[in-house]
Amino acid sequence: MNISDRLEQTLLRPDSMEEEVRLACMGAKSHNLAALALPPVWARFAAIALAGSPVRLDVLVGYPLGTHTPSVKGLEARLALEEGAAEITFVPNLAAYKTGYRETFSQDVAYTLKQCRLVNPDAVVKVLLYLDLLSQA
């Protein structure tokens, strides 16, 4: 079994430059990684750089804290998929969950997933939870 095809590389710094993203794409391809996770601003560039390789582009939505409204997350996800992302990892509204607004939390997740499915029914959609934030009172 080759573990590298199960690994995902990330480059999520807000000050990442084009050359760093290009090198991350090249590295993900040369190491046969499963995916490369990037902010939405790099979706189109990375999709072109990764074209023809098995490396999937994973774009983070609502990152880093999940405080975007569902409509903003939905738009981010749709645009990322339209620009070539194969996966979406999104951060839900944990503040809503922690303060007892479970319906708001559920709607946030459901809306983002629905928007992804409208563009690409086969896209992998993942939820990123900061568990340490859940345990803080």
Q: Positions of the model-derived regions?
A:
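Conserved N-terminal beta1-alpha1 strand-loop-helix module at the mouth
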Residues: 1-74, 82
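Conserved beta-strand positions in the central sheet of alpha/beta enzyme cores
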Residues: 34-37, 87-89, 126
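Alpha-helix-loop-beta-strand connector modules within alpha/beta enzyme cores
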Residues: 40, 44-65, 102-137
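Short hydrophobic alpha-helical runs that function as membrane-insertion/retention elements
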Residues: 58, 88-91
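A short acidic, helix-capping loop that chelates divalent metal ions and anchors anionic groups
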Residues: 66-67, 94-99
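A structural-propensity feature for long, helix-poor, extended segments
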Residues: 82-83, 93
